């Protein structure tokens, strides 16, 4: 029996809970969605984060048009932090490729370096906050300052969560009893999240230095 191809309208109008629909699905020749709980969880986290940051960006863009907006100086250290995230993203891309080749000895070293870079970013961000406060730019002194501290703090919290999962993945790789697919999937997913955080930082950083 020749299986039927489904178009977009068919997919949107189908009723998978109906018995007749179930019989029709058996004739479907397309690929089914096969995502692990980790994949679905990551997609959920990224979706919520995108919505969350987008709402703040919209309010930021509206608020900066008012007369009481006072632009604050951007610490030069933020450029260094951006470079650190850029290097981390490159290293994660290499770690993913080495993981696919099952070269986990190099993957271990790369993940340790990435974790070290994350700590460097945290330290750099703390120093940047300290420099601004020493100059009198406190959280509640101006609305622009409030948004800066809010954006950077939210990003740090997201990166801290990424560092937690990076720690778990690194432990799995050092554990010789871990399954191959588990290790490869962990490196891939954590890498995707790291790239996502880098892109979010670029958007936030670009917005802050141009407003």
Regions found by a protein language model. Give the residues of each.
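...captures the hydrophobic TM-helix bundle architecture rather than a specific catalytic motif
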Residues: 1-211
């Amino acid at each position: 029996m020749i299986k039927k191809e489904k178009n977009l309208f068919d997919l949107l109008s189908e009723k998978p809970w109906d018995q007749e629909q179930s019989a029709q699905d058996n004739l479907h020749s397309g690929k089914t969605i096969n995502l692990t709980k980790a994949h679905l969880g990551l997609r959920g986290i990224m979706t919520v984060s995108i919505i969350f940051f987008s709402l703040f960006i919209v309010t930021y863009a509206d608020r900066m048009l008012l007369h009481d907006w006072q632009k604050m100086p951007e610490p030069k250290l933020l450029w260094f932090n951006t470079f650190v995230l850029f290097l981390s993203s490159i290293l994660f891309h290499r770690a993913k490729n080495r993981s696919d080749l099952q070269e986990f000895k190099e993957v271990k070293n790369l993940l340790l370096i990435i974790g070290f870079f994350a700590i460097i970013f945290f330290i750099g961000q703390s120093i940047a906050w300290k420099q601004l406060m020493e100059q009198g730019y406190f959280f509640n002194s101006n609305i622009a300052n409030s948004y800066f501290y809010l954006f950077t703090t939210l990003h740090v919290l997201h990166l801290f969560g990424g560092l937690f999962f990076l720690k778990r993945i690194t432990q799995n790789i050092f554990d010789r009893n871990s399954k191959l697919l588990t290790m490869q999937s962990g490196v891939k997913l954590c890498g995707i999240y790291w790239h996502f955080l880098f892109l979010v930082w670029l958007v936030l950083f670009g917005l802050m230095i141009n407003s």
